[in-house]
């Protein structure tokens, strides 16, 4: 980071000497000469604080002489010196002033320079999205054909932001792009600086061998030179190499690289950069048990970071202090430091506008919440009467699925007293449009893109943000409490008891898996208990065994026996400690970590070894707070006018002739139809060899159409297309059902999705792969989404966020609940399950969770489908209470006439019966 920014500043520092001219206006000659002398002196002063003060004196003289060039250069220089002191608010202020000053001089190249500087400033402040915005604006100003140096700086800046925000895979792509640009520019020093940054990014990706190779090559180059900049470059190489060795527990090697650096950084860079290296050295002392020495280093670093307003580093070092005190059993001190760290962390998270940044950030900082919960529970063990188990539960809620919580807020329309409802809806719509464009910008960074693409997105974003500011301003005028009303808060135990488990038949089980210990909270309407579970590693190992056996698509008696044994062992781990508490009819499960991959309905009851589904209705939720938000959103919706919108049996190149030639071709195609609704993520999803017809989806949709009745949308064949999906008004429908192939990429969830028609009626290729980003962009405020495809309930497991995948995407799009699968589901078995599920919902009037349980019990009692592989894979996430509200059909004149005729006939029959009874009694 030091060299990335200093490299930019070094290239700018000569601008004063090279461009400032002698003025002919005699009235201002003396003033300008004094200003020039002071400004020249500021460049000679090594102390950045002193240099900034001298430059401010020069700035005052330039302003009095109305010297626009001197003013612009002074603003720029002062901003640079504040950055060198890690004074980010001041650096931002002066860089913005410099940007305006260069704009007044119509100097496009210098404007690009300042935008790049501002990108680095925002990155250091932790406002990564603003950093990307500045880099994007700079890219829009430069000539891509000629200015490879500037392109390299921009790509390097985006790499820095990606690395800092927890997206090193994006950082690697951008670093490689920057290195290529510097190579084209034939700038050897910058080329090797970027080689160093690639080494650092490889370290973040835990590719330690590749990291050391790149860092050593860069170090060899810098040590071959003999100048001040090269010494700093070499020092940063040593810093990164020290981090690599520390990560591999090679502490002696790490210290060899790290110990000489702080003194050099204090002389040549900044106290903040020196403090960061010292904090890393402190971690080595902590690992070696020298806790007092480590604590002293952390305390000194914390003061530096707080003074520099470096929130990211400050939160990290306070966490380190809390962790250290926790290891010494100083629980009060540990709680204080950890609480401070989490408060700063929450402030940073609140400023993140991107779900990708928020999710990545959550994964990076999850251990802070884990340590805090562990600390509270250790205190609870010592004094159970304090009620710290409640505080620990609320910390667990704070730690999980926060990016989804923020996104759900974006989909909700709040009723604010005194505010125009149309204005509220306009603000909500603009906020979601901004979110969509932001995600598109971040996603674009991860691949090859053209300047025009980023330019268009940035222009649109600027317009949307300006519109949003105006609307928010009006809302604030109408209600000063608007800012507080629109914020999301996590649920307390009392709120959970009042609005989530409000009856005696419901219990919430919230799991938290930790390195030192795991916990489960069992919350009923009038009670809360917490139970200690084995460590995360122990649970993870057993989960892997159970999941592999459950997802086996060819179960037999031997695999079923091994599955039963492993499932009993897992049940003993995660349910055994609370077996006596499982006396409710409904269990809401908030899973954590590997437990997200297990259908709890299959786990055996610790009391009698029967699957939980035999006795309990199982509901899943990302968190209790999100379940409450989903419920609130659903309550605000008007009644639906239609029941079902279903998409399935799409057209692929491989089954095109089937749809053109009719039923006979369909019968032939059925013989080569795959058994599972899954596409291998390594394959090309538009390749005919990987996208084959699923014969049972056609039968499934026919059955659903019969059950749902007239007025439903059943989009099959060529109608099962992207265009129909994106243009359907889902607010009219209660259920969205998708029956097709699913595609899962657990490492890159944005590449997961499902397939609709890949060709049109003329056999022209079309975009039929619906990605997770497409799902996020949908407006889908339905009561229920059913993803009748393979592994649609899975995604990337990110600590603190859970599974990032299609289920999350549809909840953001507006769905109150989602039914999805955890493994490659069998085509025929899924069709059968869906038949019973929909009959239970729409004909028997059961709520979705109850209907799913009944359908799964029906299948498991059928000898053909009794293996859990066939029935246990589907789970329900989200709202569970209410049945699907069927629309009341409008009564036509003809139907009213029939009803009157029938009613009249019944009335005559009733009167005749009364008369006959009276006559019989009289006759008797």
Language model region names:
Residues 135, 456-459, 463, 593-596, ...:
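A domain-level signal for caspase-like cysteine endopeptidase catalytic cores
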Residues 488-495, 557-565, 569, 684-751, ...:
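Functional beta-strand-loop-alpha-helix junction segments that form "active/interaction loops"
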């Amino acid at each position: 980071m030091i060299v990335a920014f200093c490299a930019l500043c070094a290239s700018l520092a000569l601008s004063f000497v090279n461009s400032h001219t002698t003025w002919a206006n005699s009235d201002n000659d003396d003033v300008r000469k004094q200003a020039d002398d002071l400004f020249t002196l500021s460049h000679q002063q090594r102390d950045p604080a002193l240099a900034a003060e001298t430059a401010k004196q020069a700035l005052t003289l330039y302003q009095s002489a109305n010297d626009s060039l001197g003013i612009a250069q002074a603003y720029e220089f002062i901003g640079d010196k504040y950055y060198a002191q890690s004074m980010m608010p001041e650096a931002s202020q002066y860089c913005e002033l410099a940007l305006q000053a260069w704009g007044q001089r119509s100097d496009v190249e210098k404007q690009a320079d300042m935008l790049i500087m501002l990108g680095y400033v925002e990155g250091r402040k932790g406002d990564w999205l603003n950093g990307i915005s500045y880099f994007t604006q700079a890219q829009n100003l430069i000539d891509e054909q000629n200015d490879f140096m500037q392109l390299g700086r921009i790509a390097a800046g985006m790499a820095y932001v990606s690395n800092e925000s927890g997206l090193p895979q994006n950082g690697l792509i951008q670093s490689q792009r920057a290195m290529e640009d510097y190579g084209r520019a034939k700038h050897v020093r910058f080329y090797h600086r970027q080689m160093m940054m690639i080494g650092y990014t490889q370290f973040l990706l835990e590719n330690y061998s590749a990291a050391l190779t790149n860092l050593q090559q860069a170090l060899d180059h810098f040590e071959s030179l003999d100048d001040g900049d090269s010494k700093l470059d070499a020092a940063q190489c040593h810093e990164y190499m020290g981090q690599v060795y520390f990560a591999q527990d090679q502490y002696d090697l790490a210290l060899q690289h790290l110990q000489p650096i702080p003194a050099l950084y204090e002389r040549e860079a900044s106290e903040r950069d020196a403090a960061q290296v010292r904090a890393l050295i402190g971690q080595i002392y902590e690992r070696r048990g020298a806790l007092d020495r480590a604590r002293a280093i952390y305390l000194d670093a914390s003061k530096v970071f707080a003074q520099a307003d470096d929130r990211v580093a400050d939160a990290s070092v306070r966490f380190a202090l809390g962790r250290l005190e926790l290891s010494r059993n100083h629980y009060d001190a540990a709680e204080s430091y950890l609480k401070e760290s989490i408060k700063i962390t929450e402030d940073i998270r609140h400023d993140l506008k991107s779900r990708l940044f928020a999710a990545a950030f959550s994964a990076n900082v999850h251990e802070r919440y884990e340590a805090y919960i562990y600390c509270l529970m250790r205190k609870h063990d010592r004094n159970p009467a304090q009620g710290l188990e409640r505080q620990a539960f609320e910390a667990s809620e704070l730690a999980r699925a926060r990016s989804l919580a923020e996104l759900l807020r974006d989909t909700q329309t709040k009723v604010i007293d005194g505010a125009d409802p149309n204005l509220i809806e306009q603000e909500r719509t603009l906020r979601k449009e901004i979110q969509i464009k932001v995600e598109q910008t971040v996603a674009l960074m991860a691949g090859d893109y053209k300047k025009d693409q980023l330019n268009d997105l940035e222009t649109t974003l600027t317009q949307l943000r300006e519109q949003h500011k105006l609307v928010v301003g009006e809302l604030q005028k109408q209600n000063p409490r608007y800012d507080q009303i629109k914020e999301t808060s996590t649920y307390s135990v009392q709120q959970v008891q009042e609005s989530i488990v409000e009856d005696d038949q419901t219990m919430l089980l919230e799991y938290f898996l930790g390195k030192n210990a795991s916990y489960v909270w069992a919350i009923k309407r009038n009670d809360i208990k917490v139970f200690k579970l084995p460590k995360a590693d122990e649970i993870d190992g057993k989960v892997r065994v159970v999941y592999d056996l459950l997802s086996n698509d060819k179960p037999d008696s031997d695999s079923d026996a091994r599955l039963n044994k492993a499932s009993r062992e897992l049940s003993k781990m995660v349910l055994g400690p609370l077996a006596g508490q499982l006396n409710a009819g409904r269990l809401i499960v908030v899973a954590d970590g590997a437990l997200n991959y297990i259908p709890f309905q299959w786990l055996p009851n610790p009391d009698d070894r029967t699957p939980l589904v035999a006795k309990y209705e199982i509901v899943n939720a990302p968190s209790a707070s999100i379940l409450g938000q989903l419920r609130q959103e659903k309550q605000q919706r008007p009644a639906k006018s239609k029941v079902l919108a279903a998409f399935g049996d799409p057209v692929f190149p491989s089954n095109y002739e089937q749809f053109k030639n009719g039923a006979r071709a369909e019968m032939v195609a059925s013989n080569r139809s795959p058994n599972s609704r899954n596409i291998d993520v390594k394959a090309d999803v538009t390749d005919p060899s990987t996208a084959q017809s699923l014969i049972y989806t056609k039968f499934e949709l026919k059955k659903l159409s019969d059950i749902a009745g007239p007025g439903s949308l059943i989009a099959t064949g060529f109608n099962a297309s992207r265009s129909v999906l994106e243009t359907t008004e889902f607010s009219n429908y209660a259920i969205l059902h998708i029956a097709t192939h699913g595609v899962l990429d657990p490492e890159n969830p944005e590449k997961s999705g499902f397939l609709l028609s890949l060709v049109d009626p003329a056999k022209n290729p079309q975009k039929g792969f619906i990605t997770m980003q497409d799902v996020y962009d949908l407006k889908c405020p339905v009561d229920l989404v059913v993803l009748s495809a393979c592994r649609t309930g899975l995604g990337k497991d990110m600590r603190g966020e859970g599974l990032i995948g299609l289920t999350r995407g549809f909840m953001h799009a507006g769905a109150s609940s989602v039914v999805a699968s955890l493994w490659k589901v069998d085509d025929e078995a899924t069709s059968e399950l869906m038949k019973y599920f929909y009959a239970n919902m729409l004909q028997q009037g059961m709520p979705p969770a109850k209907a799913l349980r009944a359908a799964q019990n029906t299948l498991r009692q059928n000898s053909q489908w009794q293996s859990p592989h066939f029935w246990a894979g589907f789970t329900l996430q989200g709202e569970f209470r209410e049945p699907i509200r069927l629309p009341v059909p409008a009564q036509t004149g003809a139907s009213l006439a029939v009803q009157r005729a029938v009613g009249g006939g019944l009335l005559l029959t009733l009167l005749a019966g009364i008369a006959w009874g009276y006559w019989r009694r009289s006759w008797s």
